[in-house]
Design a protein with these regions (language model features):
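Cofactor-/ligand-binding subdomain signature composed of acidic, glycine-rich
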Residues: 1-39
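Short, positively charged patches
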Residues: 8-12, 48-52, 63
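Gly-rich Lys/Arg/Thr-decorated short loops/hinges at beta-loop-alpha junctions or inter-strand turns
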Residues: 28-36, 96-106, 218, 233
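Short, basic, glycine/proline-bearing loop/turn elements
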Residues: 32-42, 107-108, 132-135
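A short, well-structured juxtamembrane/interface segment
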Residues: 42-57
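Glycine-rich phosphate-binding loops that contact phosphosugars or nucleotide phosphates
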Residues: 64-201, 210-214
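Short, amphipathic alpha-helical interaction segments embedded in low-complexity terminal/linker regions
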Residues: 210-272
Length: 272
C-alpha cells in the first residue's frame, strides 16, 4: 500500500465523534474551519507568485485553465464561471476542466480521476501559448490532475498546483506550488471540508487579485460587471451614483444610454 496522504489522516479531536451531540459536532467543525484562513495566509507567498504569473499571461493574450476532479474540479469550474459576470471578461479567460466532464458537476463519475492519460489529453486539447494551467487536488495525487498539469507544461507559460500536501506528485510537478496544510478532517479523508474551504479561498484570491491587477475594477468597484438582472442593474446605478455624484435617476439614464456599462457611463461623465 502506498504512503497515506496527509489529507487521509485521522483527526484526534474527532475520535469520539459517534458519541457527540449535534452541538458538539457543529462546534468541532467550526473550530476546525477556523484554522483554514491561517493556513491560507501561510501560503500567500506562493499565491502571490501565481497571481503575478496569471496577470502576465493575460497581458500576453493567455488564459487560465483550472483542472480538477470531484470537489476540486467543481470548485475550479465555479470560480471560472463567475469571472464573466463579475469582471466582464470572455468565458474562455478562466476555464474549468473537470474529470468526467460536465456530468461530474452534478454527480460522482466513478473512476474519472484515475486516468492520467485523460487528464493529459483534455488539457492538451485546450491549452495554448501563454496560458496558465492550475491543477487542483487536495491530496495532490489525483492522476487526472497530475496528467493535466503534464499536458500543459510544454505549452503553457506556467503551471500551478493547489494542494494540501507539500510532498505530493502535483506539488512537485508544478512551477508554482500553493500548499495549504489544513491537517486531517473531522471525517477522515473527506477533503470537501477544510481542504475544500481552503481551495475556494485560494481560487477567490487568484481570480480576484489577477483581475484587480489587470485593471478590471476601479478600486473596490466592479465596473465591468454585466448588469443582466435587476439586482445587478441596481448595483450598477449605485456605482455610477457614488463615483459621479449623479442622482439615481440620472445615473440610471446614463447607464441606459451606455448599454448598462458602468465603465462607459463613468467615462461619459468624465468627458462632460
Amino acid at each position: 500500500m502506498s504512503e497515506r496522504p496527509g489529507t487521509e489522516g485521522r483527526n484526534p479531536r474527532a475520535a469520539g465523534l459517534a458519541s457527540f451531540t449535534t452541538r458538539e459536532i457543529l462546534e468541532l467543525m467550526n473550530d476546525e474551519d477556523q484554522t483554514v484562513p491561517a493556513a491560507v495566509r501561510r501560503a500567500i507567498p506562493a499565491i502571490e507568485k501565481a497571481v503575478e504569473a496569471i496577470v502576465d499571461a493575460i497581458a500576453r493574450g493567455g488564459h487560465v485553465l483550472y483542472v480538477g476532479a470531484g470537489t476540486s474540479g467543481r470548485l475550479g469550474v465555479l470560480d471560472a464561471s463567475e469571472a464573466p459576470p463579475t469582471f466582464g471578461v470572455e468565458p474562455e479567460l478562466f476555464y474549468g476542466i473537470i474529470a468526467g466532464g460536465d456530468q461530474a458537476l452534478r454527480s460522482s463519475i466513478e473512476g474519472a480521476e484515475d486516468s492520467e492519460w485523460e487528464g493529459r489529453r483534455d488539457v492538451a486539447k485546450a491549452v495554448r501559448a501563454h496560458d496558465v494551467v492550475v491543477g487542483i487536488s487536495a491530496s495532490g495525487r489525483a492522476p487526472y490532475v497530475v496528467g493535466g498539469l503534464e499536458g500543459g507544461e510544454n505549452v503553457a507559460s506556467k503551471t500551478v498546483a493547489i494542494t494540501c500536501d507539500p510532498s505530493s506528485p502535483l506539488a512537485r510537478a508544478a512551477d508554482i506550488a500553493i500548499v495549504v496544510e489544513v491537517g486531517p478532517e473531522v471525517l477522515a479523508g473527506s477533503s470537501r471540508l477544510k481542504a475544500g474551504t481552503a481551495t475556494k479561498l485560494v481560487l477567490n484570491m487568484l481570480s480576484t487579485a489577477a483581475m484587480i491587477r489587470s485593471g478590471r475594477t476601479r478600486g473596490d468597484l466592479m465596473i465591468d460587471l454585466r448588469a443582466t438582472n435587476a439586482k445587478l442593474r441596481d448595483r450598477a446605478v449605485r456605482m455610477v451614483r457614488d463615483v459621479t455624484g449623479l442622482d439615481e435617476d440620472a445615473a440610471r439614464t446614463s447607464l441606459e444610454a451606455n448599454g448598462w456599462s458602468v465603465r462607459a457611463a463613468l467615462e461619459a461623465d468624465r468627458q462632460r
